[in-house]
From Swiss-Prot:
The reaction(s) this protein catalyses: a 2,3-saturated acyl-[ACP] + NAD(+) = a (2E)-enoyl-[ACP] + NADH + H(+)
Pathway as given in its UniProt record: Lipid metabolism; fatty acid biosynthesis
Enzyme class: oxidoreductase
Gene (UniProt): fabV
Protein name, per record: Enoyl-[acyl-carrier-protein] reductase [NADH]
GO annotation, biological process: fatty acid biosynthetic process
Keywords assigned: Fatty acid biosynthesis, Fatty acid metabolism, Lipid biosynthesis, Lipid metabolism, NAD, Oxidoreductase
Gene Ontology molecular function: enoyl-[acyl-carrier-protein] reductase (NADH) activity; NAD binding; trans-2-enoyl-CoA reductase (NADH) activity
Function according to Swiss-Prot or TrEMBL: Involved in the final reduction of the elongation cycle of fatty acid synthesis (FAS II). Catalyzes the reduction of a carbon-carbon double bond in an enoyl moiety that is covalently linked to an acyl carrier protein (ACP).
Binding positions (substrate): Y225
Amino acid sequence: MIIKPKIRGFICTTTHPVGCEKNIQAQIEYTKQQGKIANGPKRVLVIGSSAGYGMSSRVAAAYGSDASTIGVFFEKPATEKKPGSAGWYNSAAFEKQAKADGLYAKSINGDAFSHEIKAKVVELIKQDLGQIDAIIYSVAAPVRKLPDTGEVIRSSLKPIGETYISTAIDTNKDVIINATVEPATEEEVADTVTVMGGQDWELWLSALGEAGVLAEGLKTVAYSYIGTELTWPIYWDGALGKAKIDLDRASTAIQAQLAPLNGEAYVSVQKSVVTQASSAIPVMPLYISMVFKIMKEKGLHEGCMEQIYRLFTSQLYKQDGSAPETDQARRIRLDDWELRDDVQQACKELWPKITTENLFELTDYKEYKEEFVQLFGFSIDGVDYDADVDTVVEFDCLSV
């Protein structure tokens, strides 16, 4: 099949297996060049491991610390008529390379929210690794099926209290618009917390703890985002923000649970990056296009892989073994460079100046669009997109 990108809204409906593999190879090469992580983890479970920060965490653990990794994700393999999801190809590429390099890597494809997958992971850990010493929680799902009742709960990308009106980009037409988003109801806010809050992270730690597979000194981290004043109304002050605050609650509860093991639980607040999740949030494509340009000019720009390598080396696994630096809510702040006063002041000054006519000139919107399609394996150097490729990529992946 010859595959070209087809974009509908904030989703690319096609994926390119060769491009996805190149993406993973680039992350692996970056990590190898950085060198080994002192005191790094050796047996790592990544929940939500197929893309974004989760995949970068798996790469950092495996290639920065020679760790055995188990990845959990919910992805679609290809059919004869349709390519698989990008996360499927990413995971296949990682596992292929890891095994070629003599690293233990196994994956389980299924609903991370279910009891069944937790039981399957416990079984696999007991069988192959005995225990684990790190758990990365990086699930970005818009919908959650409650494991006890089967009820399906949906999250909302909405403000709280009043209608949100802001400058934004219509990414289909590449024009500046005024985006209007109606406020969430109380039920929508509660549902968003149920889907995107910390409850499932807690359930994972409980299931693994009860099974006795958590090692002494275990570290677990969940990824979050706070953003800036420009994005707070739709994000931190909106329904999503309430879910992220619930992650903080869960972090404290898990920390207490891990006390007998001298374990640690943290929320790590990351910088804004181009992901399918962030592209769905009104205002984020414009903000990201601006802040990327400013951070690149200042030599501060990082993608997912750079962020996670810095998280591991400067916070979670320091050479001297000391604890991470945290804010008042015990969060690790990897958004520190993005939130620098000079960066944010430049964003505030640039924001009102953006028009359709100067969008490509004043921001990194061209690069934003390119990075977006790269998530799906397109616009990657060294890939022949006119070549016929086999979309069916199989690997030894357990499914639940």
